[in-house]
Amino acid sequence: MKKLLIYIAAFAMILAMNTSCEDMGSLEEHPKKVDATTFMANAKEVESVINSIYFQLRRDPGFSRYLIVLEEGLADYCIGRGNYATAYDTGLTSGGVGFSKDSWAVLYRAIRFANNILDGIGNTPLSQQEYNNLTGETRFLRAFAYSWLARNWGAVPFFDEQNMNDFNKPRTPEADIWKFVIDEADYAASNLPEVAKAAGRPSRYAALALKTEACLYAGRYEEAAEAAGLIISSKRYSLVEVGKADDFLDLYGHTANATSEEIFYIKFNRDSGSTIAYMYLCKPNPFVNMGAVGIYTDYQKNKFIQNWDQNDLRYQFGLYKQTQNGTLNALTK
């Protein structure tokens, strides 16, 4: 069980074998470059374009559903169902490609918005602090998107504001992608505020957290420890105290917000259209009847669940049991 933060999203499978729930089509959207002479005329207008990056990340193929299921379906504690089962079994069936290509697309769309902003922001009349904060946030989000591309696909095509109109580019080596993410995180950490200007937006410490993770992927362990140490020494964050299973509601519950553990997060609720909850149920079940929903775990057959210490508070909080066709299943909350 993981927290609904930047590392968790939920996914659904109400679709045909070769299509995904939200039809992303292709990347051929006939995009129009932002004209800084008619738009991005001030800091608020730049922020409105930055919000478009967040919108891409929050779409169904992003962190609302598909993106993480490709990883969750591979976890020892989960079993994929329907098209999500193919991500575990083969990875590249027609159904599996439908999900992964859409996740790929939203990440590159987020990058495209970031590149457009960085290409045009030099024409916007801004104070030095506004420029630093806005470019820091934009470059953080672009690096964040590249980090998810690299962790899922390794070497990927690379586009920035200098070459964003080049097409049919070959893949850039994975090591170069991680170097870019680390360099961008350094810039963001130097230009973002100590305290995020709004909930859900990045701060200096979000950039340091991104650098920490990127350095681990890149095998730059001393730099990872140094960046993490700066977060720890700030004393701005701490673990939520848990003494009984229900205390996890203080961290994962629907009323939890801006807890002491949260550095950067993308959150969803019932009204936002996210389907995270039902993606962790199997069908049929007494809670929701909505297709052959996504991932769950089998209590009797899954060795990870069988061997999990039932005195572990995470076990007590994160699993509940349901009978399906005479088989007892444990489902993540």
Residue ranges of each PLM-predicted region?
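Bacterial N-terminal signal peptides that target proteins for export
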Residues: M1-I8
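Conserved, well-structured interaction surfaces
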Residues: N42-A43, E47-N51, F55-P61, N83-W153, ...
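Acidic, glycine-rich segments characteristic of secretory precursors and extracytoplasmic regions
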Residues: L4, C21-L70, Q306
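Elongated scaffold/linker segments in the mid-to-C-terminal portions of large proteins
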Residues: A85, D89, G98-D102, S233, ...
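Bacterial Sec-type N-terminal signal peptides, specifically the leucine/valine-rich hydrophobic h-region
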Residues: I14-N18, Y146
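Short linear capping/connector segments at secondary-structure termini
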Residues: P31-V34, L92-G95, D160-F167, K244-A245
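Short, surface-exposed recognition loops and adjoining beta-strand edges that mediate ligand/DNA contacts
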Residues: S64-R81, F159, P193-L210, L216-K283
